[in-house]
Every structure is written in structure tokens, then in C-alpha cells.
UniProtKB/Swiss-Prot annotation:
Gene designation: GST1
Residues that bind glutathione: 42, 73, 77, 85, 97-98
UniProt-listed InterPro entries: Glutathione-S-Trfase_C-like, Glutathione-S-Trfase_C_sf, Glutathione_S-Trfase, Glutathione_S-Trfase_N, GST_C, GST_superfamily, Thioredoxin-like_sf
Protein name per its UniProtKB record: Glutathione S-transferase 1
Organism: Onchocerca volvulus
Entry's Gene Ontology BP terms: glutathione metabolic process
Pfam families xrefs: GST_C_3, GST_N
Length: 235
């Protein structure tokens, strides 16, 4: 849960200070992630913060997983860069927007491919998955099982099945077992997270490439341990 020290610090920072602090920002390509102090702030759920948590887990970089309550959010909201979470505090510098955070950490942890073309393709995958994520929000937050099932049925044919078919094809055409390039990237973690979100609703045995992919990513050091210990939440 959020600490009073964190709230006071957030309240005392203006918008410019929250986004940049020239004294502590490091040159690109010369970063030592373990020397930074990271605090990730989000609700007690996977949602838009889970790919970020997977990045930390895979890179074996420590951070504070600051899970706030709705009451705490009322106080914190006007003090965030864009009025929503997740947000990441990096040694006093605050960054908003989940994909911007993924881009920052992916670059620091070596998970954005090996060249600018691969980086662009990785971000294309991230943005494509975000389109599906947006459509799934009502379903992920619905607690009534009957309504939840109906919501998923409505989305299945139009959005979920095309997603599964598309990424099954991508992996079948891949010679590396990865979505982009020849090593694990933010794209892999983004697709993995979406498949884990859909786990109870889809039959991955009908998609052998995706099933193998989920097993491979899920067994990676750091990822395996995080999946086992992460809090059980409804979204």
C-alpha cells in the first residue's frame, strides 16, 4: 500500500519535476538499472501494470510494487502526470503511461530488439495488443459470472479469435520462437500477458504455437517465480 512519505513527496512535486529531473537522468545506453530506485504505483490488480512487473521479473531488477486502494487513489490522482496509473518513480523522476514505462524499461533491460526496425515492430505489437486490451476492460472488471460470460461471447468472434489466429501465424512463421527478432522482448511479454489473461476462456491446445510459446515464456527464470508468487486478483 502507498506510504505517507510517498504521498507527501508526490504532493510536493510540480508537473515538470514529476516528469524530468536533469540532475539524475542518465545518458541513453549507459544505464545501470540495479543502481536505480524504482517504485511502481498501480491498483491491486494486473491490468496495465502487469507487463511492467514481468519486465522487472525477467530482468531480475528489484522495485517497490506499490499497490494503492481506491481511497488512496482519490488523493493521489491529481498529483500524477496524466491523472491515471500506472506510474513509475525512478530515483525521483516520475513517468506516466504504461507503454512509455515499458519502453523505458525495455530499453534499459535490453528487451527492445537489436535495431530500430525490431524496436518499431515490438512497439507495433504492443499497440496492437492494447487495442484488444481496451475492448476487454469491461469483461476483466465484471464480477457477475453470467454477465462476464456474455461479455466474452460477444468479444470472442470479433476480437479474441482473430488475435489468437494472428499470433499463432506469427509464431508459425518465426524461426526463433519469438514474436520479434531472435531473443525475448517486450513484444513476447505483452503477448504472453494477454494469453495469460485469456487463459480460462480459450483452448490453447487448438493453437499449438501459442501453447508452446506460453509454456516457454512462463518457464523463464524470474517469470516463473513471479507467476507463482504474484497476488491473486480479479483483474
Amino acid at each position: 500500500f502507498i506510504t505517507m512519505n510517498f504521498v507527501v513527496e508526490a504532493a510536493s512535486s510540480n508537473a515538470n519535476q514529476a516528469i524530468t529531473s536533469e540532475n539524475s537522468i542518465k545518458p541513453k545506453g549507459k544505464l545501470q538499472p540495479q543502481m536505480e530506485k524504482y517504485t511502481l504505483t498501480y491498483f491491486n490488480g494486473r491490468g496495465r501494470a502487469e507487463v511492467i512487473r514481468l519486465l522487472f521479473a525477467l530482468a531480475n531488477v528489484s522495485y517497490e510494487d506499490n499497490r494503492i486502494t481506491r481511497d488512496e487513489w482519490k488523493y493521489l490522482k491529481p498529483r500524477t502526470p496524466f491523472g491515471h496509473v500506472p506510474m513509475l518513480n525512478v530515483s525521483g523522476n516520475v513517468l506516466g503511461e504504461s507503454h512509455a514505462i515499458e519502453l523505458l524499461l525495455g530499453g534499459r533491460f535490453g528487451l527492445l530488439g537489436t535495431n530500430d526496425w525490431e524496436e518499431a515492430k515490438i512497439m507495433a505489437v504492443v499497440l496492437n495488443i492494447d487495442e484488444l486490451f481496451q475492448k476487454l476492460i469491461p469483461w476483466t472488471h465484471e464480477k457477475n459470472t453470467t454477465k462476464k460470460a456474455e461479455l466474452f461471447r460477444n468479444l470472442s468472434e470479433s476480437d479474441v479469435m482473430p488475435f489468437l489466429g494472428r499470433y499463432e501465424k506469427f509464431l508459425k512463421e518465426s524461426t526463433t520462437g519469438h514474436i520479434v527478432g531472435n531473443k525475448v522482448s517486450v513484444a513476447d511479454l505483452t503477448v504472453f500477458n494477454m494469453l495469460m489473461t485469456l487463459d480460462d476462456e480459450v483452448k490453447l491446445e487448438e493453437y499449438p504455437q501459442l501453447a508452446s510459446f506460453v509454456n516457454k515464456i512462463g518457464q523463464m527464470p524470474g517469470i516463473k517465480e513471479w507467476i507463482k508468487k504474484r497476488p491473486k486478483t480479479y483483474f
